[in-house]
Amino acid sequence: MSKFPIESKYNLAYKIASLVSDSLDVEHGEKVQHKYFWIWRADFEDELKASILEKFSELKTPKKETFLHDYIYNFYFAYFDYQEFWFLDDYYNWKIEDIIIFFEEKYISRLKVYDALNNSDINFINSIYQIFRESNNENLHDELKDVLNLYFHFLGNKLEDEKLMYLIGDEVFSLLFINKNFLFNYSKKMANIILELKKENQIDKLVQRPSYLPIWLKNAIFYRDRGTCQNCFKDLSNSISLLDLNELHYDHIIPLEKGGTNDPTNFQLLCKTCNKNKGIKLKKPKRNFVLYWERDNLKNNLKI
């Protein structure tokens, strides 16, 4: 019997998305941050603040490569570094087959899903497993130390492959981009840091309103929000003629006056009336996700 829970090899993007989301949780966020980032001997808040300061100019205009992508990549690497650290701290108490299962469940099955292993890689992995099986269970620490370091180096190179990293990053981003509570918490976290930087005179002024929004961003926000006002849920999908365009408002979730940015993650669709009423107030989303449809028997009974 394996000492590890069976994990779906398809759940890596969900796992990373969950870690990123949990890192901003009011009650448990600091615990998640510490759990994964103390290995790097880095203070999460200090690192985040330094990153925002370094890339502040990029938050002034919408870019397809968002700040959230960098945030995701940090958790992507921190997650695997965490697995490696605790494995190396305890593996000599394990059975050989459990060691092999660990690598298969945590690394190999996931790399296979993304077609990140070629025939040469598979042969190398099998040769490593053969060394494991031929080792002395009574003296694992001494016998396998160099082999494990070589194996983790191999896995690290695979995980750092840009094509794989960007693919997983896009999957995680897609999961988080539809989560309104996360977007509010994430944008508010950034806004608080930006206000702090302004107070410390590390930046001259807050982000200003852009002269225009690129069509790719408008399309993304419109289709993500199902052409629906995110406050009153008015259907705006028919408001696409020149006469009706003023009814569509691409609102900053966290107002610029309160430290908000022009990062794509800080926009939502509102109708003209709701946008006017919201003004520069902070307003949490009424729904975490946009419904595809409402079931009649549950309508008005559930808060999503």
PLM region spans:
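Mixed-charge, low-complexity interaction segments
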Residues: M1-E196
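Short, Lys/Arg-enriched, disordered terminal segments
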Residues: M1-F4, F289-I304
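General structural signal for secondary-structure boundaries
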Residues: S174, L183, P214-I215, L282-P285
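Short, charged surface segments at domain edges that flank catalytic/cofactor-binding sites
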Residues: K188-D235, E294-N297, L302
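Histidine-centered nuclease catalytic patch
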Residues: K234-L269
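Short Cys/His-centered divalent metal-binding micro-motifs
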Residues: S237, F267-V290, E294
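Short Fe-S-cluster ligation motifs
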Residues: G260-T273, N277, L298-I304
